[in-house]
Amino acid sequence: MKIYEVLLSDETAEILIALSRDWEAEGNCHGYRANDRSDLEGSRVFLAEEDGAVVGYLFGHSYRAKTGSSVMAQDTPCFEVEELYVVPARRSCGAGRALFRFAQAAVSPGADFITLSTATKNWRAILHFYIDELGLDFWDARLFLKTR
């Protein structure tokens, strides 16, 4: 498997948008909608490729914390992972881990923290992935109860 960073081109945008449509069709994330080009603009993009086909992606952006918190001081440089997606056939094979680790190495010179949010319906699996496998710390939770 080849993992690399790529500049956003028309071809790359088409690939990411097609994969995000597949992700939306899976229906495994609350409120997820497929990307359009504007969702990708200004992002750093990392791809996982196998046998010439893109099997996963991670994209995100750098930012500075606007307010201080119990975790980080105001103006702390961070990198927000907007999306990390791996095609179903390549899940649990290390592609997501490899994408995250590659992006971590690439962004860490300019970011004190990597942050992300998730809306997956399988929260146990995603927390296992991010906390147990990748070593992220749990910081915040937003829960909901549908009443009607």
PLM regions with names:
Residues 47, 53-62, 80, 85:
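Conserved beta-strand in the GNAT
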Residues 107-119:
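Conserved GNAT acetyl-CoA-binding A-motif
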Residues 65, 117-119, 127, 131-148:
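Conserved catalytic-core motifs of GNAT/GCN5-like acyltransferases
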Residues 24-49:
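Active-site rim helix/loop that mediates acceptor-substrate recognition in acyltransferases
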